[in-house]
């Protein structure tokens, strides 16, 4: 709708414009800060692809941090066989690659599905968590994977029509938000620390994979997601992988 002019500006996660651009998931897979992506050409590459679709990328204005698997039952290794999980497209391939069965469901249904054991877990970012879920969630699996990024975007024609001084104001505010929302930054780390402390008080424990199991978990997440990107975009995918990963 943004690309067709129904809206002038939109703020949303990249998961919402994957239907417009199959390469969109690379944003959640970035292993560089956004300042680094702006320097190495990664941001410009994606901005050009979005521009072709009629959308101007302004900035990444917020980040809810890494996604996690949240569970009602304990697991002792990175093997999800025997678990039925609520999923979104973001991490469906990853969870299925480790043996889970999956189903989609609207956000308001997650509590009930966990409560009645229809599902034993779900994926969700580190921040932006729904407090009542603590009653039906027992564990957060570490490490997290991907990042939950939100972007400010404009209809390309509308953006082109704006006076330069207006563009400058928008860009200045957007870039300040982009820097502030960096997961490696102090403000995000402080928010995450506060969130983890609250979860601990609610009785939500941590399952942390270490050593080879940690490496396997992280690699499985990366391989599953990039596998989808490369399959959907054989031309741009390999180039973007070089720009977005270390």
Tell where the protein language model's regions lie, with residue ranges.
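N-terminal secretory/targeting leader peptides
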Residues: 1-36, 48-246
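Core domains of carbohydrate- and sulfate-ester-processing enzymes
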Residues: 41-45
């Amino acid at each position: 709708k943004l690309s067709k002019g129904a809206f002038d500006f939109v703020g949303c996660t990249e998961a919402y414009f994957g239907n417009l651009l199959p390469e969109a998931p690379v944003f959640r897979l970035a292993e560089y800060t956004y300042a680094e992506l702006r320097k190495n050409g990664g941001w410009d590459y994606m901005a050009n692809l979005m521009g072709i679709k009629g959308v101007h990328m302004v900035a990444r204005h917020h980040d809810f941090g890494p996604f996690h698997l949240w569970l009602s039952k304990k697991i002792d290794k990175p093997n999800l066989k025997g678990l039925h999980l609520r999923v979104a497209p973001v991490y469906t391939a990853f969870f299925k690659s480790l043996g889970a069965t999956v189903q989609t469901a609207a956000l308001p249904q997650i509590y009930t599905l966990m409560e009645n054991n229809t599902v034993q877990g779900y994926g969700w970012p580190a921040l932006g968590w729904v407090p009542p879920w603590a009653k039906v969630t027992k564990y957060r699996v570490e490490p997290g994977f991907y990042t939950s990024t939100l972007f400010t975007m404009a209809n390309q024609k509308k953006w082109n029509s704006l006076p330069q001084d207006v563009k400058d104001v928008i860009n200045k505010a957007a870039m300040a938000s982009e820097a502030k929302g960096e997961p490696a930054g102090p403000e995000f780390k402080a928010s995450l620390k506060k969130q983890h402390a609250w979860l601990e008080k609610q009785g939500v424990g941590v399952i942390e994979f270490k050593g080879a199991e940690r490496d396997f978990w992280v690699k499985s997440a990366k391989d599953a997601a990039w596998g989808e990107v490369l399959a959907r975009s054989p031309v741009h995918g390999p180039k973007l992988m070089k720009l977005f990963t270390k």
